[in-house]
């Protein structure tokens, strides 16, 4: 198949995806929307309408439990410990600095209810609030620093500028910053006893504003110029002559959508920005109840004195400390050649500013460190995560849950017989043999360790049911395939895939280059982004752009055409996030299979 034909077909698939998502929105089929989000991703044009729907029905929003930066659970003593609120730097539970000194921000700031000397003076409370607002504004404005360097020049030349009246202005930026600040303050007014302010909250708000307009009114016309989003241009790469450069843009100017498709979308927002921001945080900084889980393990395995070793929630999802431990375990197993030099080059000592990338990667789900387009795709996965809709399965992942809300979900898609659904019905990247046939949460499969033992048993004695494939095939034709592993676990393998994708480059990098890469990962989905920006272009503009880019990478000699095969991660030129997701799924299966084999060999 020629490259031109390949990209024409991809353009057709993307157009079909846009139309299908709009139809699912019209039907309020949030179950199918969630499946599309976690497998294919939501088109950038439609995240502003799809994300609120996904968050409205997200299990982690209906029954929330978030990580805390005010207390730390100590598994050795089985007790909580207060963090030092007066410390200039807080260290989170995984042992690395939550906010490096290079940030220059007062990490761990909490809204005060009373003063330190137990006074109830309103003046003290107001002073604390003013100080907190200043910190938040300072952190938010770091996103716009590229604009600040040329703002005065832009203002002075605005009178002679030929920019369109609808072009974003400095005033728009100020309004957006104020909206983001208010969203953060409202979140803290509800959750500050559990989660104090830290710089990550600012960058998570900025990440949301890249896809959901912070100034979106309650009712709107989709042809109005009210869809202002942040465009991710936080680094000053543009020339000084670009006086009208801003950090915001019109969503539909950047990612076009035909008028007849716009007219099918709702014209009322589902949530305000601050409401949506809170729900997003409930998903991204979600954490299981570690203490409760370890107490259950102690109860269910009383004969095992080393019960902590049975805490291995790689399927249900662990706390932040567990995630980082698993990341380095997987990293060292899958990429040993890269792991050792990277560990030597990048000092991973606690309280080191060089570990700040761990904070952004894991605690903040890619905020600041990933490019806007890649982060949006990862957040699609988080927001689209859905376990099998029954009470015991939901409780397996949300081990603290006391609510009953499985009735909110449906197992069958509303348009299950469409060509689109039949094409993508078996598209779960993170599948694993036999895992989907184990009734998670049902005794005896109430802990990850018992599920892994069952996978071991089936592998050891080759007891896979002969009709399991037929059953799965029949099930998939009539029901939605639901998530098997936690989205936070999936993120671990996506990050390892990113490192594998760039392995050859990283092996050649110097220490400073490695640090820059980890804190500012290059875009991974160039082709996807270009495709959606040119989705409705007529002619062969998209094909010419892609073909020219690929031609520049080919060997000059035609005799070498037979060598155009993938010889390493850097040889891939598609730059599609779906390719990266497939790589992450392969790494997940490869790693877990090794774990099973090691346990199998260690058994008597």
UniProtKB/Swiss-Prot annotation:
InterPro entries: Rab-GAP-TBC_dom, Rab-GAP_TBC_sf. Keywords: Cytoplasm. Residues 41-386 form the Rab-GAP TBC domain. It comes from the Eukaryota. GO terms for cellular component: cytoplasm. It is found in: Cytoplasm. Belongs to the OCA5 family. This is Oxidant-induced cell-cycle arrest protein 5. It comes from Candida glabrata (strain ATCC 2001 / BCRC 20586 / JCM 3761 / NBRC 0622 / NRRL Y-65 / CBS 138) (Yeast). The gene is OCA5.
